């Protein structure tokens, strides 16, 4: 299938400001089953320079520079991708002892995965909850991940367009949250049992509730399978309806646009996301 999306973000300032460098994560990541067909980035006012990099976690990062004051900033990214369906469970966990929890990653991977194993929860509440789910899944790794996904899916979904993810304990206790809250809880539960997990930001097609805003989901690293996506908001594995913009150990680094400006001005943001 082909996915075609346009994402426009417009900042307005009540007085002229000098824009500092702006960091964009609006360029889709490549995956074996998904490839970019067309991409267009439009920025007003016209930047003095755009530098496209690969950041420390392998994401495409675009740094944008300006040399004139402005009262607005409009960034529009339009992209079209070929996204092929595939079997997300077509793998064999190896070494075989990784098929059950708890397990140890092969020694060469441990250092590389440390950022994705760092504990998120400040208390033991999430670990105890994760242990209960794992016991119900006979401590099978894949069965645990699916059960965790479905358990969070049963929470009460809330639209929350701004703000950092809630602490995982808050989402667990309240039984409600946004997609980024669900994802942060999923990650915390995985890491509490020694499964490397990271936060992914991007777009989701085919869900009217989600496709007009940024979406968040998780990826876990499974020996023999690599990084595999799980979407606790959908209660599903990630196949071909998701477009990946950035994946990171720290959710606060996943913003599509970040930067500073100099000037005594307030700003407002208007955002529009459309699948075409």
How would you describe each model-predicted region?
Residues 1-90, 94-101:
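Intrinsically disordered, low-complexity N-terminal segments that are enriched in acidic
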Residues 22, 71, 106, 162, ...:
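Short capping/connector residues at structural and topological boundaries
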Residues 28-37, 85, 152-153, 173-178, ...:
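Short low-complexity stretches enriched in small and charged residues
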